[in-house]
């Protein structure tokens, strides 16, 4: 095939190119790369360029037919034949084909004259009519005018890119913003394209600020937009039959799905993608956000999505959206969010059944996970994209753990932010009071960010745009992944996190990947400083979250999806007998998952079921009892205002999830710690603690209480 090499078109740095062997392998993609508008430009391709190397552009027939010609009409108006999605002035394809076949044509710069008929036809319409009417020919038989007609339509769509900037239509599908992140460069794009067309799975890791979250998923969506449904990548383009090329593919609008652990990440990434594609707001864009109650939020709910959907979903909702997805991308896998691990398991197990093209895992670091990933995914492609901070980050190990003295020595300038990591919400609130009592100058603004804060995006937007204050942000590990605070120049990190373990939890040191993520909160927009008040040899090397989680949610989801409870797990518990113990417990409390799995799964998706015992009520109780339970679930987080009905007390007593108070101690601060043991415990640590203010103490030593909620933890007599 007569084509130019990509290396002859684009400037390729041989020293930094990660995949030199594949660049000229895909020369036909030279003008269909994702435009970063820094080195690859969203461009208008000229007739001259097409005529010089027509076969270089032939593959554009597929996305043009898919995105434009597939639902187009031929129109005749003012003696001009053209393509339009209008339903007026239509003319049949056979009529136009006969006009073209039986008359002499004069090919001019902008259109084609049909001699003797006083008619003109656009190159797009000429190409459409002559190609659709001769679908048995090979692509190699297309003439340069037909190929230019394809490109004229592609120019109209705005899906073409080039090594040089050219004019383009004002009404293109997208208006791409400039990005110089490493993942937008040609070698990485072509590697992602290769994975896409070969239907391979991959694990992607790399340095901070290379575009793991902001770019890589967008590349999979871009190639899905252009080529979803096309399967014939194993032969040369010129040998392909037109019929096979554009009529055999399945044009179902399969989505690209990016799965993230938290709603705040979904919102921030959603806004990022919307703006990067040139949209002012989410409605009318291809971006769809999925998390609980998103329909109530006008800024984040897309009631009019276009084209091939690009879905950003929290892991909890992803597990029900994997079907009809082309590329399933699970980000932040190093966090081992429970539903993230479940989503990985469903995608791998159902890949063939659901015709998933790619499963893509993204992580800051993979050292602790790579052995398991290689076992779980056979022949997975491993991609590492090296990157340094866009700006230098100075790392300091500080023996003085006093945050006040550190701030005095390293306080950022006005308009900048400092992020201080602590392990618990309680610790954050304590230090907020301390800082507010010491930093009394009005120049300082102090914020807390954690999972209980509902308006995180609004807080971040406010402090990023406020140039008149110094912003001090106290955060749990909530801020360590993906969320970028553009004016952050300083991070102070005690290296600790609170790890939930069944009904209790403990403070522990963070992992290597978490350290990298926290350090990476600075150095993206400007130079920064990372101060740690711990030694790096205290970092955790391995930690299995599943060893400290109840397994009933895994079992319920796996049962519904006909998956093996143990072998299909992405991360397996060290003690496999826990699975059998959980299954036996379900039987003992009259939860027949074999008989009622559809009902149970629907309730599991509709309500925040934080205790497996609730499922027994949905199966065995009356409608009025179920209504009481649902009202309780909706109000549990405002339990101090909730009036507990007597009938609901009876229901929970019957569930019989009991615990005994085994110890009561008073802290130095005057609070009361009560220790409990779960009676008839079937899994995990049976011991847990609750703290009360002395005036609000409600428990008595050796008394039995009933657990009615595990998250938040709530007991009744």
UniProtKB/Swiss-Prot annotation:
Ranges for domain Helicase C-terminal come to 406-566
GO MF term list = ATP binding; ATP hydrolysis activity; RNA binding; RNA helicase activity
**Residues in domain Helicase ATP-binding?**
193-384
**Which cell locations does it reside in?**
Virion
Print the keywords alphabetically. Answer: ATP-binding, Helicase, Hydrolase, Nucleotide-binding, Transcription, Virion
Q: Which Pfam families match?
A: DEAD, Helicase_C, NPH-II
Record-linked Gene3D superfamilies:
P-loop containing nucleotide triphosphate hydrolases
Supply the PROSITE patterns for this chain: HELICASE_ATP_BIND_1, HELICASE_CTER
SMART domains attached to this UniProt entry:
DEXDc, HELICc
Origin superkingdom: Viruses
**Entry keyword Transcription:** yes
Cited function? NTP-dependent helicase that catalyzes unidirectional unwinding of 3'tailed duplex RNAs and plays an important role during transcription of early mRNAs, presumably by preventing R-loop formation behind the elongating RNA polymerase. Might also play a role in the export of newly synthesized mRNA chains out of the core into the cytoplasm. Required for replication and propagation of viral particles.
The entry's family comment says:
Belongs to the DEAD box helicase family. DEAH subfamily.
- Name it: RNA helicase NPH-II
């Amino acid at each position: 095939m007569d084509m130019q090499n990509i290396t002859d078109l684009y400037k390729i740095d041989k020293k930094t190119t990660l995949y030199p062997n594949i660049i000229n392998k895909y020369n036909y993609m030279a003008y269909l790369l994702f435009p970063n508008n820094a080195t690859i430009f969203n461009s208008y391709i000229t007739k001259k360029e097409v005529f010089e190397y027509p076969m270089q552009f032939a593959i554009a027939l597929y996305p043009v037919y898919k995105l434009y010609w597939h639902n187009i009409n031929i129109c005749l108006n003012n003696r001009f034949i053209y393509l339009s999605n209008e339903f007026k002035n239509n003319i049949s394809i056979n009529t136009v084909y006969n006009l073209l076949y039986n008359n002499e044509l004069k090919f001019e710069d902008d259109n084609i004259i049909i001699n003797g008929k006083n008619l003109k036809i656009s190159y797009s319409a000429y190409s459409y009519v002559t190609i659709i009417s001769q679908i048995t020919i090979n692509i190699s038989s297309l003439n340069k005018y037909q190929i230019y007609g394809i490109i004229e339509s592609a120019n109209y769509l705005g899906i073409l890119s080039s090594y040089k900037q050219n004019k383009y239509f004002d009404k293109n599908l997208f208006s791409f913003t400039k990005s110089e992140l490493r993942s937008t460069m040609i070698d990485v794009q072509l590697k992602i394209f290769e994975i896409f067309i070969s239907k391979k799975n991959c694990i992607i890791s790399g340095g901070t600020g290379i575009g793991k979250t902001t770019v890589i998923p967008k590349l999979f969506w871009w190639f899905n937009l252009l080529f979803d449904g096309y399967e014939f990548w194993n032969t040369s383009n010129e040998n392909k039959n037109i019929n096979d090329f554009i009529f055999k593919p399945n044009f179902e609008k399969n989505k690209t799905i990016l799965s993230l652990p938290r709603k705040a990440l979904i919102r921030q990434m959603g806004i990022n993608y919307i703006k990067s594609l040139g949209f002012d707001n989410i409605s009318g864009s291809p971006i769809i956000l999925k998390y609980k109650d998103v329909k109530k939020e006008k800024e984040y709910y897309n009631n009019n999505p276009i084209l091939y959907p690009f879905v950003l979903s929290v892991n909890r909702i992803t597990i029900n959206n994997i079907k009809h997805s082309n590329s399933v991308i699970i980000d932040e896998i190093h966090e081992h969010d429970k539903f993230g691990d479940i989503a990985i398991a469903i995608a791998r197990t159902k890949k063939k059944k659901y015709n998933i093209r790619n499963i893509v895992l993204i992580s800051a670091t993979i050292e602790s996970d790579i052995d398991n990933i290689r076992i779980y995914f056979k022949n997975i492609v491993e991609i590492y994209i090296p990157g340094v901070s866009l700006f230098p980050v100075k790392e300091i190990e500080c023996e003085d753990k006093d945050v006040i003295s550190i701030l005095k020595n390293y306080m950022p300038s006005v308009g900048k932010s400092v992020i201080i990591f602590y392990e618990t919400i309680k610790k954050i609130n304590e230090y907020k009071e301390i800082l507010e009592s010491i930093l009394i100058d009005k120049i300082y603004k102090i914020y807390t960010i954690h999972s209980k804060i509902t308006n995180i995006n609004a807080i971040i937007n406010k402090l990023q745009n406020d140039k008149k204050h110094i912003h001090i942000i106290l955060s749990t590990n909530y801020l360590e992944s993906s969320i970028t605070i553009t004016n952050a120049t300083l991070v102070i990190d005690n290296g600790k996190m609170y790890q939930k373990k069944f009904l209790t939890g403990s403070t522990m040191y963070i992992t290597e990947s978490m350290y990298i993520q926290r350090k990476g909160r600075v150095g993206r927009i400007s130079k920064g400083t990372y101060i740690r008040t711990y030694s790096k040899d205290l970092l955790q090397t391995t930690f299995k979250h599943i060893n400290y989680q109840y397994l009933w949610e895994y079992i319920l989801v796996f049962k519904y999806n006909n998956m093996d409870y143990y072998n299909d797990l992405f991360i397996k518990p060290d003690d496999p007998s826990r699975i059998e113990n959980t299954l036996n417990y379900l039987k003992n409390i009259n939860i027949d998952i074999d008989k009622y799995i559809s009902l149970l799964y629907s309730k599991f998706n509709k309500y925040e079921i934080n205790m497996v015992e609730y499922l027994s009520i949905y199966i065995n109780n009356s409608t009025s009892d179920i209504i009481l339970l649902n009202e309780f679930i909706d109000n549990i987080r405002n339990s101090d205002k909730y009036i507990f009905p007597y009938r609901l007390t009876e229901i929970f007593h019957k569930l019989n999830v009991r615990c005994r108070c085994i110890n009561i101690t008073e802290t130095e601060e005057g609070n009361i710690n009560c220790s409990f043991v779960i009676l008839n415990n079937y899994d995990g640590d049976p011991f847990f603690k609750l703290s009360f203010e002395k005036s609000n103490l409600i428990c008595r030593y050796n008394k039995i209480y009933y657990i009615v909620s595990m998250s938040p933890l709530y007991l009744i007599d």
